[in-house]
């Protein structure tokens, strides 16, 4: 899951 913030890695 991406969690609370969208990770852009």
From Swiss-Prot:
Keywords: Amidation, Neuropeptide, Secreted. Belongs to the FARP (FMRFamide related peptide) family. GO terms for cellular component: extracellular region. This is FMRFamide-like neuropeptide AF9. Transmembrane segments: none annotated. Its main location: secreted. The keyword Mitochondrion does not apply. The modification Phenylalanine amide is found at residue 9. It is found in: Secreted. One of its GO terms (biological process) is neuropeptide signaling pathway.
């Amino acid at each position: 899951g991406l969690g609370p913030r969208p990770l852009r890695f």
